[in-house]
């Protein structure tokens, strides 16, 4: 079971830390009410442009969100991806998927930019129009 909580972050890292703690407490309270055995908890967080997301699960999980900004999409994708694109949305979808996958693997992004993703990726809903996000598990 996985859950995610999305909050606008208008203050600073202290607030983001509070969001992580709140998400973990909410997730744990659900399990402590229903189970008496210890539960292994996995969590992942991401923030961009004043927004933060936290994902909690009983299995490995990775999450990433990115605010879409103007960049040299074709040059970056040619250098780092197997797929070449000059489209902003396609670029950010690929980047976000690879970041979420990297967090799931607990690895470095440089090792996974050209990797084929063999895990389930789900797009996050409810984000602002200029923000894209994925959860990997």
PLM feature spans:
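Core catalytic alpha/beta fold that binds nucleotide/phospho-ligands
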Residues: 1-137
């Amino acid at each position: 079971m996985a859950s995610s909580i999305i909050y606008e972050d208008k203050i600073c890292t202290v607030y983001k830390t509070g969001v992580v703690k709140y998400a973990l407490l909410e997730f744990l309270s659900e399990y402590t009410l229903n189970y008496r055995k210890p539960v292994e908890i996995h969590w992942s967080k991401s923030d961009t442009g004043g927004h933060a997301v936290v994902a909690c699960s009983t299995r490995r999980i990775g999450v990433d969100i990115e605010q879409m900004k103007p960049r040299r999409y074709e040059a970056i994708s040619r250098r780092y991806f197997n797929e070449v694109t000059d489209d902003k949305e396609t670029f950010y979808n690929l980047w976000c998927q690879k970041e979420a996958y990297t967090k799931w693997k607990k690895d470095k992004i440089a090792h996974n930019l050209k990797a084929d993703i063999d895990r389930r990726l789900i797009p996050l809903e409810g984000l602002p129009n200029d923000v894209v996000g994925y959860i990997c598990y």
